[in-house]
């Protein structure tokens, strides 16, 4: 019975991954276009680029996961470990890039232009090696946990790389959400006297939203890992496994919100597109009416 449940559940999860890939690719391309093309993109642009790059790797791994979960592909465990490392590294890399982008945004509020340029250069020299090293070490720890689990399990199927344990989800929640947010909150507290009320509320709002979404994505799988979800509710295990995929949506949105000064660009672009579409529709109907009138005049003549 358990085998039948698994065989029915994996194709549904694979289909969900496919839809997530389609919509997340469209969203990621839209966020990059809005950030680079239609905004000033002056504050933290390097960190925004690194965040989008990390999430693009994570997004384009979704079709591979889809093929593995559906059973169409079969890969050795070592290659699964490589995919798992890239997946985790991209998440941590994007999360820590967001941290330094938030610090850059706070410095933009606190300092004048000469001091801001000096602090930005110093921060860029320090942050990129830190981001690479921390992300690599954190992803390596997750990889070691997977190898230990894979050795104890006799199933040679590659989707074991994507069945995360509750302990792994706790680590991901702490490493990619809790610690980065707490560090930025500490930095805000140290610069509290230099920030205006509106600026402080803007940054703290973004951090709280990121903390909430990250907790929603990782906490159910981490907290309910010991429960046999197949016996409680059919498909609950797949929901828990699919929730962490939400990061491909909220991390690019947070990068866009922190990197761009004008957040009304999407609204204005949609309004312009709708106005142009209405103009074209009205012009076409007007031409059709004029052509019918001309035909009627010719018939009368």
From Swiss-Prot:
Superkingdom of the source species: Viruses
Entry's family note: Belongs to the G-protein coupled receptor 1 family.
Localization: Host cell membrane
Cystines in this chain: none
Assigned keywords, A-Z: G-protein coupled receptor, Host cell membrane, Host membrane, Membrane, Receptor, Transducer, Transmembrane, Transmembrane helix
SUPFAM superfamilies: Family A G protein-coupled receptor-like
Organism taxonomic ancestry: Viruses, Duplodnaviria, Heunggongvirae, Peploviricota, Herviviricetes
Membrane association type: Multi-pass membrane protein
Kinase found in the keyword field: no
Topological domains annotated Extracellular: 1-15, 70-82, 144-168, 221-238
Pfam families listed in its UniProt record: 7tm_1
Gene3D superfamilies linked to this entry: Rhodopsin 7-helix transmembrane proteins
Cellular-component GO terms for this entry: host cell plasma membrane; membrane
Residue intervals on the Cytoplasmic side: 37-48, 104-122, 190-199, 260-301
Transmembrane segments: 16-36, 49-69, 83-103, 123-143, 169-189, 200-220, 239-259
Source organism per UniProt: Human herpesvirus 6A (strain Uganda-1102)
InterPro entries cross-referenced by the UniProt entry: GPCR_Rhodpsn (IPR000276), GPCR_Rhodpsn_7TM (IPR017452)
GO molecular function terms listed in the Swiss-Prot or TrEMBL record: G protein-coupled receptor activity
Listed name of the protein: G-protein coupled receptor homolog U51
């Amino acid at each position: 019975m358990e085998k039948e449940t698994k065989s029915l559940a994996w194709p549904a999860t694979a289909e969900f991954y496919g839809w997530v890939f389609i919509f997340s690719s469209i969203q990621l391309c839209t966020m990059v276009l809005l950030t680079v093309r239609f905004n000033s993109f002056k504050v933290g642009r390097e960190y925004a680029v690194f965040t989008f790059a990390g999430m693009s790797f994570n997004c384009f791994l979704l079709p591979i996961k889809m093929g593995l979960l559906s059973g169409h592909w079969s890969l050795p465990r070592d290659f699964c470990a490589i995919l798992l490392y890239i997946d985790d590294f991209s998440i941590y890399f994007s999360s820590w890039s967001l941290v330094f982008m938030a610090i850059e945004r706070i410095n933009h509020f606190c300092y004048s232009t000469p001091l801001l340029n000096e602090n930005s250069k110093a921060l860029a020299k320090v942050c990129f090696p830190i981001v690479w090293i921390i992300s690599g070490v954190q992803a390596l720890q997750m990889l070691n946990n997977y190898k230990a689990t894979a050795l104890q399990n006799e199933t040679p199927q590659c989707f074991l790389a994507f069945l995360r344990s509750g302990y792994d989800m706790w680590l991901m929640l702490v490493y990619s959400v809790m610690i980065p947010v707490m560090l930025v909150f500490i930095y805000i507290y140290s610069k509290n006297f230099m920030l205006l009320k509106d600026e402080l509320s803007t940054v703290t709002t973004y951090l709280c939203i990121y903390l909430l979404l990250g907790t929603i994505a990782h906490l159910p799988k981490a907290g309910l890992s010991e429960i046999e979800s197949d016996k409680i509710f059919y498909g609950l295990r797949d929901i828990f496994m699919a929730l962490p995929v939400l990061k491909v949506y909220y991390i690019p949105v947070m990068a866009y919100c922190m990197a761009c000064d004008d957040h009304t660009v999407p609204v204005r672009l949609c309004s312009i597109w709708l106005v142009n579409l209405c103009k074209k529709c009205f012009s076409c109907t007007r031409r059709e009416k004029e052509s019918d009138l001309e035909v009627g005049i010719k018939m009368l003549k």
